[in-house]
Amino acid sequence: MADPGLRSGVGLPSQQGQKHDLQKDQKQPHVNNADRTTQSLLNSYIYDYLIKKDYCEAARAFGREAQVQTLVRSQEETNSLAKRHKRMSPVAVKHEGISNNESSDENMNVNNGNLDSFSSSSAPPPPPILPIDSAGGFLIEWWNVFWDIYNARRGQGSEPAKAYMSHISNLRKKSRLNLQEIQKNSLHTGNTSHPYANASFPHDPANAMGQQIDSSQFHQGAGGLNDRNQHLMRQAMLNNQSRETFPPTAAQLQQLKQLHYRQLQSVQQQQKQHQQKKTPQSGSTPQMQNTTSQPTTHDTHPPKQQGPISDFRSIPSSPKTEGAPSNAQFRPSLPATPNGSVPQSNPLYDTTGLNGGQYPVVQNSAQPLLHEINFASNRNPHLKQGGAVPSSTLPQQQKSLDKPKPAQQPSTGQFSGNQMNQYGFSNSPYSQNMLYNFNGNANPSRLNPALKNYMEELKLLEQQNKKRLLLVSQEKERKGYTSASPDRPLSQTITESSVAKTKSTTPKSTDTPTEATTSPVKVSTKNSNTTENLNGINESNMPMLQNGLPLRTSGDHPSNYSNLIENSSTSDTNNADNGMDVMGNWQLQQTHSSRPTPNASSPLDVRSKQKPSSANSNAPTPAPTVNTTNPESSTNEATSVGPALEPSQGANVHKSDSELDNQNQSGKSNPDTSATPSAPTESTTVATKSSDNQLLDVGNSTDIDAALLNDFDFDKFLKDTSTGDDLWFGLFNLPDNEDSTAA
């Protein structure tokens, strides 16, 4: 392409051309040769566009003003073109071009010839000198392509343009993803796996031109790059990421590589500094490292902990080691004592073999668990009362804690009761070895021996209580006596021999009258038919109080008051004023009567047995005796209750059926005197007859009486024979009192 300084196509005089060049140079003093070439090339294409669109006048004016370089044609050719209006081919243009090495005289001749062609209106303007020529014009073709692509970005345009834009958008997405991966890898330490981070780019102008980054700049950037600069660089990367630039330019790629290299250098330097800081500290604390790395075995206790202790309930998780149990115990760290020493750790508290995924770790919990507080309060009665633990129990408990214990193999989910210490609760000797089974495997073999004994004793005691309640209820239904008043004290004159003798003597059921037990009798009966109570006794046959209310039966009283039967030898006639004092002086006795007896048909189907009655006894009998009368009507009975006889009252008086009826009528006419029984003034006996009523024979009768209270050992109940401590229960077995009732 010719130099724009050689204006071959302009027919201006030499002086005018020099002046014009000087003026143009003054207007554009800083334009270099490359810019002049680009501007001259654009003017040539504009001139070519005007000629091919047949804008001849505009082309002549523009060529004259812009000094466009044109081809040199002869006069004949100019005339022929004027006639035919044909254009020359691009090959002819190249061959007819004027060389830059031609002399100025020849150029002037050419310019003069071209001036005639510009001035002639008949011939078309001469064609410009172009490197690339096209039939329709290069400028118009470029414009059509640009406009089609521009419309394709908005969804319009031709199909080829749309396909081209979709392909370009996919390439941009891939380029964006690559940039994101480079950014992520640069933020992480030592991750240079991405190809853009290490590989050299073949199309990178920096690599093609052999440009390399000075290593001193990297060292300076790694040393002087602070956190703020790194943050700014990362923010710049994020901002540049939003821009849709494809493909990434060489400057961007080089910037990414520099940033990544600087970050790697800074990270490596930080790691070296961190290792240097760790090196002097590692030698000062070898004991703590040994403590955390020591594996837990089944038959060895961990050593005493030294050094600082972690926060409450912070359990460090460590990997499993050989010999460590698969399911370790859950414990918080031990608190330090006021004098600065650390108490000896319990082997159940070892956390080096803790399975990190088995139990959830509760952190920053300042309150104890609810079941732990309840357990400690149940074990220690002083905590229930809200008082302080007496100091006398502390040495004994400390003694029990200091005892050496055999190695225990940890079981699944065990939890130690010694954890109460860190909440301020006192250690009970029973909670030292208490183990909880968190997984719900209620295996008795894994329980503590003391707890196992306690559970067995509770079961045994419950069975014995049920058995005693059943036997007492059956015997009360058979004998039909009322319980003594709980307000009156137990008589000291009752002896074991008299009690056993009285219980072992029962009357035989025969057809002939037998000898009855001598006792003063006070009978209170009614002829009306009433309902039975729980003991099978008619309310009409029950003794009456002074206010007309019947006395409560033994079933209405608590079971522990059924043995309070007292001798009434010292009672006098003033007992009628206090009905509660006479409650313990009654005994149930069957007499000859025509009223139906509910005890004749007992609801309990048990084996009955006849027992002989006893003679006059020197001591009062707490167990009542039942005598059957009236063989003609075996289902009738009347209850008579009276106190036991004194030795001085030995007279036997037989009371017939008519006397009982008269007494019953008198009791109806005067309810105030008959309802409240008075003390007997003379000894009477009741002549009994045999009947078909069968007595209940229950073996091993266990009345809770004085014999049971005498045999019961309270000291053994409140003490543990193995340790001698107060455990709220004892290793005891209640006696069955087999000798209390004769077979």
UniProtKB/Swiss-Prot annotation:
A Gene Ontology molecular function term of the record: DNA-binding transcription factor activity, RNA polymerase II-specific
Q: SMART domains given for it?
A: LisH
Modification Phosphoserine, positions: S89
Q: Which GO terms describe its biological process?
A: cell adhesion; positive regulation of transcription by RNA polymerase II
Leader peptide range in chain numbering: none
Q: Where is the composition biased (Polar residues)?
A: 98-114, 282-297, 315-353, 390-399, 408-426, 482-500, 521-544, 556-566, 586-602, 661-670
Primary role: Probable transcriptional regulator involved in cell adhesion.
This protein's name: Adhesion defective protein 2
Which species does the entry assign this protein to?
Schizosaccharomyces pombe (strain 972 / ATCC 24843) (Fission yeast)
List the top taxonomic levels of the source: Eukaryota, Fungi, Dikarya, Ascomycota, Taphrinomycotina
